[in-house]
């Protein structure tokens, strides 16, 4: 199964977490497209946009990291783009709770677009990789919706 790993990538801590998670998932037999490691030859907004959009199109599933007080805007767009095409797995290891009671930890458009939700407050990157792998194996067919 080919996964597009969406998530914030603007700090060294975020990039390091993403890289560790991708390596662990690959060790579990998952092919991972990690945007931060797929730099286009031309480093401009259009090239990055096209590269990431194409990465989503070539993947079977989008796994989106939803940590932080509010999910990353680029990650939210990637989920919206993928929604009508393929399953989405939302992952949150952040113990901070956003949202309102009964509406989920973030915007309802994200909450309701997900095929699988993984909530693992305080989880290590190893625990997170295992939970994502379990979720991916529970998705019977990665065919478009």
Q: What is each model feature region?
A:
Residues 1-145:
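Conserved catalytic or regulatory cores that recognize and/or transform ribose-phosphate-containing ligands
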């Amino acid at each position: 199964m080919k996964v597009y790993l969406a998530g914030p990538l603007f700090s060294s801590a975020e990039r390091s977490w993403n890289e560790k998670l991708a390596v662990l998932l690959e060790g579990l037999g998952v092919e991972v497209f990690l945007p931060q490691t797929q730099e286009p030859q031309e480093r401009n907004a259009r090239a990055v946009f096209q590269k990431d959009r194409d990465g989503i199109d070539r993947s079977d599933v989008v796994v989106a990291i939803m940590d932080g007080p509010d999910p990353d805007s680029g990650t939210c767009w990637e989920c919206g783009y993928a929604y009508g095409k393929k399953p989405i797995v939302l992952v949150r290891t952040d113990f901070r709770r956003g949202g309102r009671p009964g509406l989920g930890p973030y915007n309802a458009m994200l909450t309701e677009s997900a095929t699988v939700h993984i909530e693992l407050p305080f989880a290590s990157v190893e625990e997170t990789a295992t939970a994502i792998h379990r979720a991916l194996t529970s998705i019977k067919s990665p065919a478009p919706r």
